[in-house]
Each structure stands twice: as structure tokens, then as C-alpha cells.
Amino acid sequence: MGVESVRCPLHFTKMQGAGNDFVVLDLRDGTPPPDAALVAWLADRHFGIGCDQVIAIEPPRGVGVVAAYRIWNADGSAAQQCGNGARCVAAWLVRDGSLADEHFLIDSPVQAHSVRCIGKDEYAVEMGLPVFEPERIPLSGFPNACAEYVLSLQGEVLRCGAVSMGNPHAVVEVDLIDVAPVERIGPLLQQHVAFPESVNVGFVQVIDPGLVRLRVYERGAGETLACGSGACAAAVVLMQRGRVGRDVRVVLPGGTLRVQWPVSGGPVTLSGPARCVFDGVWYG
């Protein structure tokens, strides 16, 4: 479904999870997914609808799954994982009346996610297993997993953690989150040779063992008000280092998320809000 071929009017729902906002399209009738140009047009905050990511809800792909979905960044590039988006898909399905249970499975581009409704506009999503092996993140130039990697960045030495939550993340611990060099370091790390598929860059400040503050510079979107997979990435990297406990609140500019990782080798659970903002019609 391209800009020229899109069937107008196009019905959509605007949703947000902790300020991370989405344009959600219902394509369960078999309508082709949008191409990169249409995604970028829809995501444009001046000439389109405006969002961090576009989500298409599609028919289920597996047994026991209620629906599948795809995600695109604001620049039109495909995304593999999005924790806030998964919760918004769940909230959309609940609002649509498509569910008979408060515990269900939805299919992302990388895996099936178990979702539970835990309160009004609150959902818990099982995000799967964190991956620390460099070749699977992917992270080049390091044969073995480390708690901290040392990179050269335009003459500076940068220390970061790295993990995949279905998409690659670098995690930089800082002393003061409000003055973290997000707009400078974020793009440089995304272009670094160590990250051949680019990377989402999280800047995290530990407040206490149960509370951290986080800002994320996302692939294809820049800094966003919240990033669910980024919250999981920051939390598990800090847990591996012993900096925080196994149940931590992550405060982002758009709201607070909860990340639980009870045991290494087990799945990570992300909990937080997901809300419908409005329904609309796009006329192109």
C-alpha cells in the first residue's frame, strides 16, 4: 500500500504508551501493509498524522495467537520489536472487543508475546529472553559477551553495555540524565562500525536499586518520550552488573514502566500504560 495507491479515506487510531505514540491501522481484512513512503508520510507531525511508529494489526500467524502486528519507524524503516507498541496493540484489541480473555498471545515480527491486562489501561507483556552474545545483537569486534564494552567514538572513549531485546540496544550509564549527551552520542553510536544494523541508544541514571531514569535515542525515530524495549535493555544490563534489583521502575520522559527479570535465562516482563488517544480518518 503506497502513497499513490492508498485507499482514502484511511481509518486509524492514535495510541500512546508512556508518551511513545503510534498510528495504528487495522489490516486484518487483508489490505496490503504500507510501504516506507506512506509510513513516513503518516508519521510526519506537520504534514501527516504524526507518531514515533506506525503499527499494522494483521490476522494471526500462529495457533493460539489472537492477532499479529508489524511496526515501522517514523522514517519508514521496519522495526523488529517495540514493548510500548505491543501494549498498545493489546489495548486496541481489548477496545475492539476482539478478546474473550484477559491473558492472550499476540505475534510481533520476532516472536509471540504473552500479554495480561493488569488494570485499567495497564498491560504486562512478556518480552522474551535478552540476548547478550555479541554476534546475535549484532555487535562487531567483540568475540565474547561483556558487562561493558569500550568503544572509540570520535577520539573519545565510551563505555556501554549491549543487548538485544529482539532489536539491538546500547546502554550508557550516566551520572545526570538531564544533561546526558543524547542528541550528540546517540547518532554517533548508531553510525558506529561496531553496530552493523545500527542500534537504539539508552542513557540511564541509577537512582536506587529499584529505580532508574532513562532516555532513549531510537533507530529511525530519534529521541522518544519512552521506549519499552529500551527500558528492558537498560534494566537487564544494570541487573547483570548488580546495579539494580530484579524488579525495577524505569522513569522515562513520558511516564514510568516496570521491568521484571526474576532469573537470568528467563523471560523479561514489561508493564505499563497503553491508551487510545483518538480515532481518525486520513484523507491523504
Swiss-Prot record:
Presence of the UniProt keyword Amino-acid biosynthesis in the record: yes
Residues marked Important for dimerization (site): 278
Keywords: Amino-acid biosynthesis, Cytoplasm, Isomerase, Lysine biosynthesis
Subcellular location: Cytoplasm
Entry EC no(s): 5.1.1.7
Site keyed Could be important to modulate the pK values of the two catalytic cysteine residues: positions: 169, 218
Entry annotation: catalytic residues: 82 (proton donor), 227 (proton acceptor)
Name of the featured protein: Diaminopimelate epimerase
